[in-house]
Every structure is written in structure tokens, then in C-alpha cells.
Curated annotation (Swiss-Prot):
GO terms for biological process: DNA recombination; DNA repair. A zinc finger (C4-type) spans 57-72. The keyword Transit peptide does not apply. This is Recombination protein RecR. It comes from Enterococcus faecalis (strain ATCC 700802 / V583). The lineage of its organism: Bacteria, Bacillati, Bacillota, Bacilli, Lactobacillales. Pfam families: RecR_C (PF21175), RecR_HhH (PF21176), RecR_ZnF (PF02132), Toprim_4 (PF13662). May play a role in DNA repair. It seems to be involved in an RecBC-independent recombinational process of DNA repair. It may act with RecF and RecO. It comes from the Bacteria. Residues 80-175 form the Toprim domain.
């Protein structure tokens, strides 16, 4: 039996989310059908609002409602340090620990030759531009401890070091293959404190 078109379209939409297959999408679709109308409307409005009201900061690439973002506008931040992360969710994770007071730069991905992702496909050019424009003394590379994250860190290090800027990498507490997003605040704090030059 085929599902009615509205259900089929909803299932298809859910399947566009990462990690959501046919079964989970179907379950979510039927859960959505069972929702109160006001909850379904609020859910739909939240989806539309995220796409309409959020954009990427023109300086650091983080998600924001205003441009530049709140962090880039904050005059109390240490402008001599930029912490480079893969995704905006990593900025959120780092901010939870409330210890790091420098700036950020979001790459929106990592180098991955297997997937055809090269330097021009992620937010590297604007990072290099920032290093020439700003008074940056240190770049902390906080890519995930995966093969692609390590390759991206090494690539960035080779690009940045000739400019005389110290390049460090997060250290203690983050195991190989782990994502920053899932680390707790104490682990992240130890990783920032124990960073090493690369």
C-alpha cells in the first residue's frame, strides 16, 4: 500500500536529515500526524525561522541572527587568538565551558579527498584573510580527532606558520575519532589548556 501523498512527502523530507532512514522517517511522520495541531504549527514555524532568520557571520562563519555575530562584536574578547572549528555546533560546545575568551572561525567542513572536499570547498580563504587583517598571534586548531580533522589541521598549520603566527592543536581529553560536540565542558577545558604547537 502506498502512503497518501502528504505522508509520503513528509517521510521523504525526514529522510533528507542525516542518519534518518526509511523506518525512522516513517515513524517520525506518523508521530507528526499524531501531534496536536498547535505543536505541529510551532514545529513548522521553528523550521522556517531557522532558515529565514539565521545566516552565517561574514567574519567568522558562525550561525547568527545579526552580522557580524555577537562574539565577533564583543570588544572584551581576546582578538589575538582564533579557535578554528569544523561546524557552528562546535562553537556552541566551546562556549558552554565559559573559559575561552578569544574569537572563532568556522570552516563548515574538513578536507576530505575521498569525498572530493578540497581547500576551496571549506571556509579557509576567509581565515587566511583574517590573519592578514587582524592582530592574531595564535590560531588554535580544534578540528575533530578524525583522519580528515587531522589532515585539515596539518594543512592549516602549513598555511599559517609562515606568517609567524603560533599554531596549536587541542590536546588532552579528546580521544581519536571523537567529536568536539559530544565532549563535556571539563574535557574541552583540559583540551584548550593542554593545546600543543603543531
Amino acid at each position: 500500500m502506498n502512503y497518501p501523498e502528504p505522508i509520503a512527502k513528509l517521510i521523504e523530507s525526514y529522510m533528507k536529515l542525516p542518519g534518518i532512514g526509511q523506518k525512522t522517517a516513517t515513524r517520525l511522520a506518523f508521530y507528526t500526524i499524531d501531534m496536536k495541531e498547535e505543536d505541529a504549527n510551532a514545529f513548522a514555524k521553528a523550521l522556517i525561522s531557522v532558515k529565514r532568520d539565521l545566516h552565517f557571520c561574514s567574519i567568522c562563519g558562525n550561525i547568527t541572527e545579526e552580522d557580524p555575530c555577537e562574539i565577533c562584536q564583543d570588544k572584551n574578547r581576546d582578538r589575538s587568538i582564533i579557535l578554528v572549528v569544523e561546524e557552528p555546533k562546535d562553537v556552541m560546545s566551546m562556549e558552554k565551558m565559559r573559559e575561552y575568551q578569544g574569537l572563532y572561525h568556522v570552516l563548515h567542513g574538513v578536507l576530505s579527498p575521498m569525498e572530493g572536499t578540497g581547500p576551496e570547498d571549506i571556509n579557509i580563504a576567509s581565515l587566511i584573510k583574517r590573519l592578514h587583517d587582524d592582530e592574531v598571534k595564535e590560531v588554535i586548531i580544534a578540528t575533530n580527532a578524525t583522519t580528515e580533522g587531522e589532515a585539515t589541521a596539518m594543512y592549516l598549520s602549513r598555511l599559517i606558520k609562515p606568517a609567524g603566527i603560533t599554531v596549536t592543536r587541542l590536546a588532552h581529553g579528546l580521544s581519536v575519532g571523537s567529536d568536539i560536540e559530544y565532549a563535556d565542558e571539563i574535557t574541552l577545558l583540559k583540551a584548550v589548556e593542554g593545546r600543543r604547537e603543531i
